[in-house]
Amino acid sequence: GAVAVSNRQWATMNPHAIYRTPLTIEEYHASRWIAEPFHLFDCTMVNNGAVAVVVTSAERARDMAQPPVHVLGMGQGHPGNPKKAPFENEVNTGAAQAGRTAFAMAGVTVADIDICELYDCYTYTTIVTLEDYGFCEKGEGGPFVADGRLAPGGALPTNTGGGQLSSYYMWGMTPLSEAVIQARGQGGERQGEKHDLVPGSSQGGPLDHHGT
């Protein structure tokens, strides 16, 4: 419930978010089951929308209208391929390999991260990604997020636009677009105080494909 409530807190400050009405933990628990252990607010919405991204060289970016956001590292992980064989491990995901690769390429660790923009088709996806990136140990994601750590004013601002759960569901473009907004310092009311390092993630299949 903490992830759903946190996302909604961020979404109330995002003029582009679809769900901007505050959500309490009591309302979360009172919502109907979709498939246990997932309540209604554990699951993302379905909506129409569009996001555009311009990718170019650092030299060319200096001449463009918007301040550039530099990609320091990237990685991907594919522990399973449902087209070839079933992937039944719902605990370890491609985020572990993708995160290690991206952070190593950038020369940073999780201790250096200012803000996270994570793929969150379900609240569980946020939790397991934080675990696999190394922000906490495996199995400790629930307690890690329970104290408002991801919410406004928390130690690790996460999905600051409301994520896919409360803002808009545009697949991997949701975290990417908000990461760019935060890194540029254009988040307005929801802008993170520190925003030098903002990883974004994307997830595919039943947790078996991940990009960082």
Model-derived segments and their meaning:
Residues 1-14, 53-59, 167-187:
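Active-site-proximal alpha-helical scaffold in enzymes
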Residues 161-169, 182-186, 190-212:
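Structural signal for terminal/edge beta-strands and the immediately following C-terminal loop/tail
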Residues 98-112, 187:
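Phosphate/pyrophosphate-binding loops at sites that engage ATP/ADP/AMP, CoA/4′-phosphopantetheine
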Residues 83-88, 120-143, 154, 206-212:
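Short glycine/threonine-rich loop-to-helix capping motif typified by GTGT followed
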Residues 136-148, 188-193:
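A glycine-biased, small/acidic residue-tolerant capping/turn segment at secondary-structure junctions
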Residues 74-77, 114-123, 164:
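A short beta-alpha structural unit
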Residues 1-37:
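Glycine-rich, mobile lid/loop segments that gate access to catalytic sites or pores
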Residues 2, 33-97, 101, 147-156, ...:
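Condensing-enzyme catalytic core mediating Claisen C-C bond formation in acyl metabolism
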